[in-house]
């Protein structure tokens, strides 16, 4: 079950990266360059109350601070994918506030 969750999260990340790469080639979604690299925060909320946070730093390309939210069906738990400018350098995150749709 946990392996399936991870595979779903990885699939969502790959799909998001492909979409961003396509939009970057077209020059649609990334008109504003940011100086620092953006971090991809994926927070998963399980029904048991335990949350799993995957932190992955994307390549330092130009990106905007638009928020992309992907939510799955409620039975699988909520999954939020958000692009934010990197506040901390590629370090470990202690705790993040809950993301609410």
Swiss-Prot record:
Similarity field: Belongs to the DMRT family.
Comp. bias intervals (Low complexity): 52-75
Protein purpose: May be required for testis development.
Region (Disordered), start-end ranges: 52-79
Alphabetically ordered keywords of this record: Developmental protein, Differentiation, DNA-binding, Metal-binding, Nucleus, Sexual differentiation, Transcription, Transcription regulation, Zinc
Presence of the UniProt keyword Plastid in the record: no
The keyword Transcription belongs to this UniProt entry's keyword annotation: yes
GO terms assigned for molecular function: DNA-binding transcription factor activity, RNA polymerase II-specific; metal ion binding; RNA polymerase II cis-regulatory region sequence-specific DNA binding
Pfam families: Dmrt1
Main location: nucleus
DNA-binding region per Swiss-Prot/TrEMBL record: 1-13
Subcellular compartments: Nucleus
UniProt GO BP: cell differentiation; sex differentiation
Source species of the chain: Alligator mississippiensis (American alligator)
Protein name per the record: Doublesex- and mab-3-related transcription factor 1
Gene Ontology CC annotations of this record: nucleus
Origin: domain of life: Eukaryota
InterPro entries attached to this UniProt entry: DMRT, DMRT1-like
């Amino acid at each position: 079950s946990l392996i399936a969750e991870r595979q779903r999260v990885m699939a969502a990340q790959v799909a998001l990266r492909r979409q961003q790469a396509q939009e970057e080639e077209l020059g649609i979604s990334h008109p504003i360059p940011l100086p620092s690299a953006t971090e991809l925060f994926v927070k998963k909320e399980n029904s048991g109350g335990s949350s799993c946070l995957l932190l992955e730093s994307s390549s330092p390309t130009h990106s905007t601070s638009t928020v992309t939210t992907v939510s799955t069906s409620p039975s699988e738990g909520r999954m939020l994918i958000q692009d934010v400018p990197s506040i901390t350098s590629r370090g470990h995150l202690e705790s993040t506030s809950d993301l609410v749709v």
